[in-house]
A protein has these predicted regions:
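Short "repeat-start/strand-capping" segments in structured domains, especially the N-termini
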Residues: 17-21, 44-48, 79-80, 101-109, ...
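Internal alpha/beta core interface subdomains
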Residues: 1-16, 21
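Conserved small/polar residues in nucleotide/adenosyl-binding loops
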Residues: 175-181
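Long, well-ordered mid-to-C-terminal structural blocks that present hydrophobic/aromatic surfaces
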Residues: 102-140
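Short glycine/acidic-rich loop motifs that flank beta-strands on beta-rich extracellular proteins
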Residues: 8-14, 30-38, 46, 50, ...
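Extracellular polysaccharide-degrading/modifying enzymes targeting complex plant/algal/animal polysaccharides
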Residues: 1-5, 69-71, 161, 165-169
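C-terminal structural cap/anchor segments
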Residues: 134-174
Length: 181
């Protein structure tokens, strides 16, 4: 398959795309490289990520749906996402929702993956001002092997410091979040 390597920032950024498949790829960056997310799907519908090997310095997959303006204007969540049989190594989060999720993330499944030596397994990042229309729902993690993962699951409700207006108080709501044992 295709290899994407040594990107100075986000490696792959599917944006407002529908019914896309990413199969048998390698996404490689040095583990000390900042802001080198492997894949940042934003406001996507019908995304499949299958058999992808990630080894990098930031989040392996970071789901997004708009930071401020685009998320509030179009209100298109990322939805119907299927991640399976992927290997995620080194990075801050193996699969991260946010922090740019102004329109939410819905119907995501991550199955039969390996997370190795990441700081976090599943990470949800929210931030004031990025959530008036945001709902995170129907998230399923199943048959995940974590080895050397410092924190398997974490929700950061106040990711970063403050937003430009300094006083936004919106919150993201979570429903049907499942982590089977």
């Amino acid at each position: 398959g295709l290899t994407v390597q040594n990107s100075p920032a986000w490696n792959l950024h599917p944006y407002f795309s529908n019914h896309t498949r990413w199969i048998d790829l390698k996404v490689l960056n040095p583990k000390q490289s900042p802001n080198t997310d492997g894949m940042d799907p934003e406001s996507v519908d019908g995304l499949e990520v299958v058999g992808v090997y990630f080894s990098l310095g930031d989040d392996c997959i970071a789901m997004k749906s708009g930071k401020f303006y685009m998320g509030h204007k179009y209100k298109v969540s990322s939805r119907n996402v299927d991640i399976r049989q992927c290997y995620m190594r080194h990075g801050h989060g193996a699969v991260t929702l946010g922090s740019e999720i102004a329109a939410g993330v819905r119907h995501l499944s991550c199955k039969k993956c390996i997370f190795e030596d990441t700081d976090r397994g599943l990470r949800v990042k929210t931030r004031r001002g990025r959530g008036e229309d945001s709902v995170v729902e129907d998230i399923l993690f199943e048959d995940i092997k974590m080895d050397g993962v410092l924190t398997p699951f974490v929700v950061n409700s106040y990711y970063w410091c403050c937003d430009p207006d300094g006083h936004s108080t919106y919150a993201v709501s979570y429903t049907h979040l499942t982590l089977p044992t």
